[in-house]
A protein has these predicted regions:
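Catalytic active-site module of serine/aspartate enzymes centered on a nucleophile-bearing elbow/loop
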Residues: 84, 88-138
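Alpha/beta-hydrolase
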Residues: 1-60
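Low-complexity, glycine/alanine/valine/leucine- and proline-rich hydrophobic stretches
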Residues: 79-83
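Short strand->helix junction
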Residues: 24, 66-67, 100-101
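Phosphate/oxyanion-binding active-site loops and adjacent basic polyanion-contact surfaces
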Residues: 28-31, 69-70, 110
Length: 138
């Protein structure tokens, strides 16, 4: 076991994380301040209200992610977006996955879900708009 087990069930990913000096460091005071500022802004009511109602959103999360409070935090954010009028939201929880679903044992499922979701959004954008025919002068 490692203090980094919250990241992924994949031992190789955790080992790489532990040995990477760009991942395994203590934030500076400025780093903590910037992270705190970002979290405050990201969770502000205005952020949700300003989000375009037609913006498609995809949330992927592990149901064993302590950072997302085991799904509770993700559900809270999704409900805030829905409450602000955002309509096209899809949420996928991966069973037993932890924080980094793209670096988890089931990462291929997550990549497939992203691909499917992107294709569905592109298909929706490509559908012809229903335009009213304009009379032409003769």
């Amino acid at each position: 076991h490692s203090i980094f087990d919250w990241i992924s069930r994949d031992r190789d990913v955790v080992s790489l994380y532990q040995s990477d000096e760009k991942c395994n460091f203590i934030f500076t005071a400025t780093g903590f301040r910037d992270l705190y500022t970002l979290l405050i802004k990201a969770n502000a009511v205005q952020t949700f209200r300003r989000t375009p109602h037609d913006l498609p959103l995809l949330f992927l999360a592990g149901d064993k992610d302590p950072v997302g409070r085991y799904g509770e935090g993700v559900r809270r954010v999704v409900n805030l977006y829905r409450g602000a009028g955002v309509k096209n939201i899809e949420v996928i929880f991966y069973k037993d996955a932890r924080h980094e679903v793209l670096n988890e044992l089931g990462r291929l499922d997550a990549f497939a879900d992203i691909s499917r979701w992107l294709e569905s959004q592109l298909t929706a954008c490509a559908e012809p708009a229903h335009e009213t025919a304009q009379p032409t002068a003769t």
